[in-house]
Amino acid sequence: MACRSGCCCNSIGSFNEDNARFLMLALLIIIYLLCGAAVFSALEQPKEKLAKERWAQRIEQFTNKYNLSQDDLKNFLRNYEEANVAGIRVDATRARWDFAGAFYFVGTVVSTIGFGMTTPVTIAGKIFLIFYGLIGCAATILFFNLFLERVITVIAFVLKFCHERRESRKAGPTQNCRRPSTDNRDRRTDSLAGWKPSVYCVMLILGVAAILVSCCASAMYSAAEGWDYLDALYFCFVAFSTIGFGDMVSNQREIYEAQVAYRVGNFLFILTGVCCIYSLFNVISIVIKQVLNWLLRRLETPCHCPGRGNRHPRRNAVVPGHMRSRRENSIETDAVNDSEADGRRMSGEMISMKDFLAANKVNLAIMQKQLSEMANGHPRQSGSSSRHNEFSGGVGALGIMNNRLAETSVDR
């Protein structure tokens, strides 16, 4: 096929990089869902069939023993199902809608766990839940993001401190006694100042923290609820990851030993566990994004069509290596423009929302940070922050972790 309009290559380079990454992730998620469905179907379907057969046998035996029709028995069982939805159990349970029970319910709402053991049944309650959840879930997500920002900052500070101690020990006593040259001292200072922890170290630390919290919480639930330890560990993951099936729910019995202490421990463990797992999920998402970037680089094919080299690639496009110098020049120009804009803002001009929304990937966390810096009189640095990599302009938690880890740094 002849080249039309200068190029006819159907390579990955003609796509926007973010769109290519999004489509590849969507495809991988679909494949992941299909594989998961196959595994769970193979594991759980035989058990489901066996349970249905046993239930049919029990109904038949019960109707024959007490001379009842199956229709009457099924109607009675439907009434029990309705009572079960309302929170009524054969064994006595705690009140669902007293203040303590309602507090537990709203906690599962705003944290998006949603166990399902308690649901509003009145029209007024359902309408109120819509507006209450809209604000509460948004505020809780913001809380999780702020927690993530702080825990990443603390971990990065500790790891950097350990790295500096290790580097100072490597220098040795002989080098410490000698007066180092100015160039070597400046070079070493710049190297330490630009060091950032690896995402894998952060992921390992968060993983260990999540495991410790889950194991301690499982021990408490196993003792208080009478669950097997493995079932308690399963409940912790379902609750902390906000999956919230509702097949196992803590703090539902009417009476517990040391009831006040158990309720406080239950609240603290769920709060801490959700924060840890949320942070761990977001760090794992960086690793997944790295894999996607690696796959995109593997799929890059250079374009040899005549006249293609005269075109300027779009920003964020996956382009061959010999064309990236032009994109770097464009980025430097953007840095100068950003610097001029910062100068105008610092000179007392009003902050224009158009300046923030000019970029097509401004998220809430970055916008809040920029507004705070402008209000406090601290302009954002335009030299390095204007540079782009695969993680620049991330949304939500990715935006918070941008340039905080080695893998998300613009200097890597």
Swiss-Prot record:
Binding residue positions for K(+) 1: 112-113, 242-243
One GO MF term: outward rectifier potassium channel activity
Pfam families: Ion_trans_2
List of residues binding K(+) 4: 112, 242
Region (Disordered) location: 374-395
Record's compositionally biased regions (Polar residues): 374-386
Residues the entry annotates as binding K(+) 2: 113-114, 243-244
UniProt note on tissues of expression: Brain and heart.
Free-text comment on this protein's domains from its UniProt entry: Each subunit contributes two pore-forming domains 1 and 2 which assemble to form a single pore with M2 and M4 transmembrane helices lining the central cavity and M1 and M3 facing the lipid bilayer. The transmembrane helices are bridged by the selectivity filters 1 and 2 that coordinate the permeant ions. Up to four ions can simultaneously occupy the selectivity filter and at least two elementary charges must translocate across the filter to convert it into the open conformation.
Protein name: Potassium channel, subfamily K, member 13
Gene: kcnk13b
